[in-house]
Amino acid sequence: MLLPKRVKYRRVHRGKMRGNAKRGTTVHFGEFGLQALEASWITNRQIESARIAMTRYMKRGGKVWIKIFPHKPYTKKPLEVRMGSGKGAPEGWVAVVKPGKVMFEIAGVSEEVAREALRLASHKLPVKCKFVKREENGGDTNESN
């Protein structure tokens, strides 16, 4: 599971997810990527589940880069507790993902294998995604899934 080693504050504000991603919008390390089309919180468990789905389909061939990290703690109050009495205890960790962010990258496998592996990974995530390819001149070409 992905989670930070240390944090300055145990509880943080929820924040707003306005606009599109400004950084991490192109395929940088691998040949193929999975790009988010919606804004959402993605938990460390969802990231790990998507990673396992990809690597199992690829039969541990190729290389996978996870380009999102769950830095943000989220809290939850216990069941059947009245409102008030402070903020709840930390429950888990989430990565804030905005539209346009490339979340996973793959290299070392054919396009058909990469497309299917990323499709399986996208089913584990709470956002709509699309398959993107790396362009030779540095950018990426977008292809809808």
UniProtKB/Swiss-Prot annotation:
The biological processes this protein is annotated with in GO are: translation
Q: Does the keyword rRNA-binding apply?
A: yes
Cellular component, GO annotation:
cytosolic large ribosomal subunit
SUPFAM superfamilies xref list: Ribosomal protein L16p/L10e
Q: List the disulfide bonds.
A: none
Pfam families noted in UniProt: Ribosomal_L16
Keyword field contains Transport: no
Molecular function GO labels = rRNA binding; structural constituent of ribosome; tRNA binding
InterPro entries referenced in this protein's UniProt entry, alphabetically: Ribosomal_uL16, Ribosomal_uL16_bact-type, Ribosomal_uL16_CS, Ribosomal_uL16_dom, Ribosomal_uL16_sf
User: What Gene3D superfamilies does the annotation carry?
Assistant: Ribosomal protein L10e/L16
Q: Which UniProt keywords apply?
A: Ribonucleoprotein, Ribosomal protein, RNA-binding, rRNA-binding, tRNA-binding
Purpose: Binds 23S rRNA and is also seen to make contacts with the A and possibly P site tRNAs.
The UniProt subunit note reads as follows: Part of the 50S ribosomal subunit.
Q: Which family does it belong to?
A: Belongs to the universal ribosomal protein uL16 family.
HAMAP family, sorted: Ribosomal_uL16
Query: What name has this protein been given in UniProt?
Result: Large ribosomal subunit protein uL16
The gene name reads rplP
